Amino acid sequence: MDCRSFYLQIAGCITAEILSCQLRPGQQMQSIRRLSVQYRVNPHTVQRAMDKLKREHLLEKCGQRLFITSDRELLRRSRQQEGARLVGAFLEDMESLGYTRTEARQMAQQAVPPSWR
């Protein structure tokens, strides 16, 4: 269960879509109203998520419209930071389950699918 505020969850979903290139650099975002219907929340909640992404420079405002940033270097750095955050969260979770660092590393290596080797 995700205990974060709805606007943070929405911002996280959109960030994941941006960093995985499901949303492309320069692509126009859907309207606040359309996103509020999609996420089943109040438009103000979506607006807060969009404001957060603008502060992080993942979204750019042009007139009344929002676009995914075209700054590929920013996107590359953001993707690396998110990857590091996910690895850190994995290691913390493994530690909370009682695994040693060595055991966690071994399990991670064993879980790598052959197509990644």
Set out the residue ranges of the language-model regions:
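Extreme N-terminal segment that seeds HTH/winged-HTH DNA-binding domains in transcriptional regulators
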Residues: 1-29, 33-37, 78-117
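A general secondary-structure boundary signal
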Residues: 7, 43, 51-54, 66, ...
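N-terminal helix-turn-helix
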Residues: 28-61
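Minor-groove-contacting beta-hairpin "wing" of winged helix-turn-helix DNA-binding domains
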Residues: 31, 64-71
